[in-house]
Amino acid sequence: MGFFITFEGIEGCGKTTQLRLLKERLVALGEKVTVTREPGGCPVADQMRAILLDAKNSAITPLAELLLYAAARAQHVQEVIVPALERGETVLCDRFTDATVAYQGHGRGLDLSVIEELNTLATGRVQPALTVLIDCPVEVGLSRALARIEATSGAKEERFERESLLFHQKVRDGYLALAAAFPERFVVVDGSGDVQQTGLLVEEALRRRMQSLGKAGLTEVKAGC
């Protein structure tokens, strides 16, 4: 079986950039890597992503939002993640089940036990071996996210960026609560700095954790590639 790593964090934390950099390092080391994301990652789930993230769809209720995420995840896990792991690849996923707990659970206030049941049903109990949480203050993350939207002439995928500071603080608190509850799976990295600074922190955190897990190849990752 392969090795499953997820990247999590609030809007604008820099997780997508750090995931891409890690992929480049691993490929340079000869690792077979599948990079994917949620919501989305395959054609059916990408259609649900378009609905979930389009700012025009502000009328989506919290429950409908939760169920759409679960449906997209069920398709994604079976079509992309499980086959890649069975091929022995390292899977890097931009958001996974923890995002649903943080956003729909802590952010929207939905029942965490219901979310846990849906996540289990959607994933078939597939879980990441390691989750990298890129953490930064809400104000920093949203400033970056809004700057990115302006730079792309108003991207459509901005429904969550339009939520209140309080919502995003609840999401951040939810992520930190998850990291505290599952320290054997999470590594928390300060994402307040620039890309290079955060990359160095990710590199060191991964090296320490991979050594403890006995994953030899991943202990060789170097930042700045």
From Swiss-Prot:
* Catalytic activity, as annotated: dTMP + ATP = dTDP + ADP
Please state what class of enzyme this protein is: transferase
Give the CDD domains listed for this entry: TMPK
Query: Quick one: a GO cellular component term?
Result: cytosol
Listed binding positions for ATP are: G9, I10, E11, G12, C13, G14, K15, T16
Q: Give the matching Pfam families.
A: Thymidylate_kin
GO MF annotations for this entry? ATP binding; dTMP kinase activity
Supply the EC number(s): 2.7.4.9
| Protein family according to the UniProt entry | Belongs to the thymidylate kinase family.
The record's function comment reads: Phosphorylation of dTMP to form dTDP in both de novo and salvage pathways of dTTP synthesis.
Q: What is this protein called?
A: Thymidylate kinase
Q: Which organism is it from?
A: Geobacter sp. (strain M21)
Q: Which gene is the coding source of this polypeptide chain?
A: tmk
